[in-house]
Amino acid sequence: MKKLVIKSAIYFFFILLVLEVIVRIFHLGKDTPARFLDSYEVEKWKPNQNGFSVTGNRRQNFSEYHINSSGYNSYREFTPTKDKIEVALVGDSFIEGFHQNYYNSIGKKIETKIPKIEVYEYGYAGYDFADQLHLVHSYKKQFDLIDHVILGIKFSNDLTRGEYNIMRGRLDLESPINKLLKKSKLLVYCKSIGVLDPPQELIYRIRKTLRPQQKDAAIDKNEALRIQQENEKKYLENFKSLVSKYNYDKKRFTLLLDSRITNSTFLSYLKKNNFTYIDFATSFEASKKSTTLIYDRHWNNHGRNLIAKTIIEHLTTIKIFR
């Protein structure tokens, strides 16, 4: 019996080893760059990293990323000067672009059409409006040299707070245990395709059983509407607070948004108070092709082409070219 257990353990180990090799050879497990908090308390990726972002159990999306010396996914370094024309794209994972090869990003698409300018992409998954303005404020000397800054914003989740503070949730992913676990591509792959979901759910249920909580009372439609209206009011106040605190430059800054999913009161406020914004809703609605990936709502290559085109039209309108 003892020999059987030992042999089984050895076979199991070798099976795991073979699977680990297969996952690595075929790049089934994604590479996740390390993140950190810099001296300005700006959360970003550690500079000078390369790897591949993989999504789906059949490698539905496979793209290469390159973290530059500034800590962002881009094919170029950020070196603004008074002698060049630069545009900054600031935002979350949609700007970060891990779903597309870094050398075929939105910024690169814009530069291909307008060789006169350099586009700097300050994209980081999870950035909200507070993160973005804190970044711009922290690197003021750099951003003051950039001719135009475009900030991506989604009303429903980018304005949930009215001031910047460090969000430890993402940084906790850099704990020693998580770093150790990420060294196994097999484990990373299993987690990405949901193999580890059942045991995690079992642990959650056991904890819930041991610590019974009161059930939340059902919310009727009127109450849900009231909560929604309160949140929308709060988000608008948060926006006002942030643009005031960080001295938002209306002449040089432009918001990038989708009016289809943006609160009408917020849009009215932007127009009334002369906040410039780029609305890509029309181009997306008119598109006969899908603008998003199959497995999530991030823009696909066609969607990114439309975003780049919309930004180019805006830059042409404001006559950024000298």
Please describe what each predicted stretch is.
Residues 148-159, 211-285:
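Conserved, well-ordered alpha-helix/loop/beta-strand core segments that scaffold catalytic motifs
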Residues 32-36, 40-42, 129-227:
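Interaction-surface signature
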Residues 7-24:
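Hydrophobic membrane-insertion alpha-helices, especially the h-region
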Residues 5, 295-322:
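Histidine-centered active-site loop/cap adjacent to the catalytic His
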Residues 28-114, 286-287:
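Membrane/wall-proximal cationic-aromatic binding patches
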Residues 121-128:
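Short beta->alpha junction loops
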Residues 86-90, 120, 147-149:
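Conserved beta-strand elements of the Class I
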